Amino acid sequence: MPGNREEFDIEKVLKSKKLEAIETSTEKKAPYTVFESTDKLLLIIVLSLVGFWSAISSPIYFPALPTLTKYFNTTPSVMNISVVAYLIFQGIAPTISSNLADTFGRRPVILGSIIVFCAVCIAISQTNVYWLLALLRCFQAAGIAPVFAISSGVAGDICTPANRGGMVGAVSGLQLAGNGIGGLVGAALISGFHTWRAIFIFLAIGGGVTFIFAFLVLAETSRRIVGNGSIRPKNVLNKAVLIYLPHFKNKITNDYSTLQPKGPFDILGPFKIFFQKEVFCTLLPSGMHFAAWTVSLTSLSTELESAKYNYSVMKVGLVYLPQGIACFIGSLIAGRCLNWYYRYRKNLYDKQMNDVPLNDRPPFNLVASRLTLTIVPLAMMVIGLSAFGWCLEYKKPIISIIISTILISFSASVMMSICTTMLVDLYPKQSGASASCVNLMRCWLAALFTGVLDKIISALGLGGTYTLLTGICLLTDLGLVYVLYTANQRFVNYVSPNQTAVNSDAEDY
């Protein structure tokens, strides 16, 4: 497979970007996208709403776990299987469907995902046996999970690297807010309707309303189908009602020069990206941060409802709210900072290379312009995670637990935004597939640690467990140091093609 590995090499990607910039620098180019700021805002709203149901579907289930354990007359460890299974399928599904979206368009895959999600939610609300509940949760995850990766693909379609971070941050912030407030919503539904079935009826209704909205206004953005947005899609599934309105109709100029060539459907595409050494070292810490956040949410509901705190379901739900807000704010701040820092480093690069011919310039250090910002979320995760475990262990005041969950959720959301943006930058033609790698790593790690959480707590206690998780986070964070070092060395040791030719001639002489 050496040929496939070369195809997805980061260094090759960066060099190709440099050559592309040189070739087109003197040409009059069509705009990167015809989507204006209002169009992008509408897309952010639609994608955020769709992704919200994907994000909320996992944590909304947590407050119901004690109730479901009693209802199905089973044990907490057996009940956790449904949580782990959900996370596994949430990770696997986007690696397949994101390729479908890259090949056949974003719109039909998103709409199909919502339909499957709604149908499964209705089925779960009528379930009376545990094995069927666990099975249907797998289908629920597989149905709606792809929208996270596809949303990042849309950002790659309509945003340049200079402003891509802002859109990824805004969309992922609104989506991950569902992950933050899911516990509160689940607790409110159980308390208000006195049945766990209300959770899935709520999800079905919310998903159905979102489907109608998306069906009307979600425009196709895939550059393989609509180019920069100026080409009218041929397939009816890719056509939104929106494109027939005067505001959008005037932008349809059928500029086929902006159309990307269609590639074959490659089911292994995401895995070819996933197992690149530098990509894997970036995915591992971001996935570990998300996994730590997920298990902290699980412990939060279990411990606060236990005899130690004896909180009601609704009171536990309220504790979830602050970290949900922190998650949303964190992603928005990350998006702003990514845009600002990219422009700062790009301007610095342009000034340094002002007197260097285009052909002799090293490629812009795109990796450093993204990953340098990870130092803040890394520090916040270490502080928040270690404090969370020991505060629960010794039954400290609830405010200390809330503050620690704020640090954890803020850190996880910022890390997700940074790593997702970087992968979309590196693989813009496979933006959906690259973003699905983030999803795959975060969900599989979350499934792994959720599955073994009870056993680790039994052996080490809460404080020891979260201290161990802190250490694992620190260990995986070393991967980012390696990636940054490699990127900087590549920049410092760059030899231009002209210099190579001169050296070669000198040796011949």
Swiss-Prot record:
GO MF entries: transmembrane transporter activity
Induction remarks: Expression is repressed by caspofungin and during chlamydospore formation. Also regulated during white-opaque switch, and by NRG1, TUP1 and HAP43.
Residues on Extracellular side: 63-75, 130-132, 191-197, 300-312, 392-397, 454-455
Residues passing through the membrane, by range: 42-62, 76-96, 107-129, 133-155, 170-190, 198-218, 279-299, 313-333, 371-391, 398-418, 433-453, 456-476
Topological relation to the membrane, as annotated: Multi-pass membrane protein
Keyword Nucleotide-binding carried by entry: no
Subcellular location field: Cell membrane
Ranges in the topological domain labelled Cytoplasmic: 1-41, 97-106, 156-169, 219-278, 334-370, 419-432, 477-509
Knockout-associated phenotype: Leads to defects in biofilm architecture.
PROSITE patterns: MFS
GO cellular component assignments: membrane raft; plasma membrane
UniProt GO BP: lipid homeostasis; membrane raft assembly; transmembrane transport
SUPFAM superfamilies from the UniProt entry: MFS general substrate transporter
Origin superkingdom: Eukaryota
Keywords per UniProt: Cell membrane, Membrane, Transmembrane, Transmembrane helix, Transport, Virulence
PANTHER family from the UniProt entry: MAJOR FACILITATOR SUPERFAMILY (PTHR23502), QUINIDINE RESISTANCE PROTEIN 1-RELATED (PTHR23502:SF51)
Family membership: Belongs to the major facilitator superfamily. CAR1 family.
Function summary: MFS antiporter that does not display functional linkage as drug transporter and performs functions that significantly affect biofilm development and virulence. No substrate for transport has been identified yet, but plays an important role in the growth in the host.
Protein name: MFS antiporter QDR1
